[in-house]
Regions:
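Cell wall/extracellular polymer interaction/catalysis modules
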Residues: 1-128, 135-154
Length: 154
């Protein structure tokens, strides 16, 4: 990942990058995207400075990845009747999440959901389609990006 003068180690989807992203394909979508918002665990990161809209992650929050739901690719609250990914995790990968504006306007069913920039596992293990970076680099990015910042994935 390159940002201004910084070269940032990252992990991507375990099946690579694609222009034909589909739900569950374990691929990172190719294209030019913007950042929508920032979600974070206030119990783990009490103060966060960002020009993005900030959302505090609560225990009952998730992201719908079920294309049969009208809430597909949106933030939801549990209990929820459709499949959704929990955002409150014991591991730290979702302590900070930057929502990438992929498949948002319009939302196309089965096109892919929950594409985030989040914290990488210690060994930079591949993701299910997200981009993951170190916590240190995440702090650097969140202090400098805003909704106009472009993310180019190719």
């Amino acid at each position: 990942l390159y940002f201004n003068k910084y070269k940032i180690k990252c992990s991507i989807g375990k099946r690579g990058i694609t222009i034909k992203k589909l739900e569950g394909d374990n691929k990172t979508p190719a294209g030019v995207f913007k950042f929508k918002s920032l979600m974070y665990r206030q119990d783990r990161i009490p103060k966060i400075k960002s020009r993005l809209k900030k959302i505090i992650i609560k225990k009952n929050m998730g992201w719908c990845d079920d294309s049969n739901s009208k809430h597909y690719n949106k933030l939801i609250k549990f209990p929820f009747n459709f499949r959704a990914e929990k955002l409150w995790l014991n591991k730290n990968i979702y302590d900070v999440i930057i929502v990438i504006n992929f498949n948002m306007k319009p939302i196309i069913k089965k096109r892919g959901s929950a594409i985030f920039l989040h914290i990488a596992k210690k060994n930079y293990m591949s993701t299910r389609g997200c981009i993951a970076i170190s916590k240190k680099n995440m702090k650097l990015l969140i202090s400098k990006i805003d909704i106009k910042t472009k993310l180019k994935i190719y």
